[in-house]
């Protein structure tokens, strides 16, 4: 009987960020402003890089790709979340849930690979400056980007395939503001052990690989910087500082989610942490990279003056 009911399940109910009605309109307005700025800032950064031929180098190719993924990541989650603030109950169909989960999975994993790729690019630029044009060719850069997106696609596809083979009959209420894997596994009436195992193996491997790539790259960068003159040190730190800040902000909440114990309070913490890297990080990244990058600021200023 449970399997029959599970087969007939056509929708989930998202609990959203808050039950308190007095907070819904203020939160809607706040996140609407954040989302609009996120989209405009990331697309604006892409436009600046596209328009200025001086920025057609690997570093900015990766930065433009990161801006695209940030806009995609935010758009996978935020529009539905905004609707939830205005609706009495947040119902999402199983088909919509699958699409949201898949879209979020691709963009989130691709961002991890892009951050690692950008760290490697900085390593080559600072540690092997004379060989940089030889190593970071257009072909290699495009290949690294393609691999990042393929990795994100395959990772999301595998989890999507094994997740929605489960049956959901315990409840159709997802304690989250979007269709995330852990809240979905919690309401499954089928044994999700294989899902947790694959989550540990695949997601864990990706996290370890990308974090190690960043750490090893910047360890070599740090040792190289310390041998340089004060002027060169400042220039190197200005180049790497934005990326290091972005990596710290992205991986901090992500790693914390895996180490704190499971509890009802932890579920609420997970929502706050998810909110940080799905909404806040895509909002902050273009600001961080623009304000700390003189070439981007100069190009943006030139573009704005040209349009006046």
Curated annotation (Swiss-Prot):
Gene3D superfamilies: Rhodopsin 7-helix transmembrane proteins. PROSITE patterns: G_PROTEIN_RECEP_F1_1, G_PROTEIN_RECEP_F1_2. GO terms for molecular function: G protein-coupled receptor activity; odorant binding; olfactory receptor activity. The keyword Transit peptide does not apply. The keyword Transmembrane helix applies. Its main location: membrane. It is found in: Cell membrane. Residues 1-28, 78-98, 155-195, 260-270 are extracellular. Residues 50-56, 120-133, 217-238, 292-308 are cytoplasmic. The chain crosses the membrane at residues 29-49, 57-77, 99-119, 134-154, 196-216, 239-259, 271-291. SUPFAM superfamilies: Family A G protein-coupled receptor-like. Keywords: Cell membrane, Disulfide bond, G-protein coupled receptor, Membrane, Olfaction, Receptor, Sensory transduction, Transducer, Transmembrane, Transmembrane helix. Belongs to the G-protein coupled receptor 1 family. Odorant receptor. This is Olfactory receptor 5H8. The gene is OR5H8.
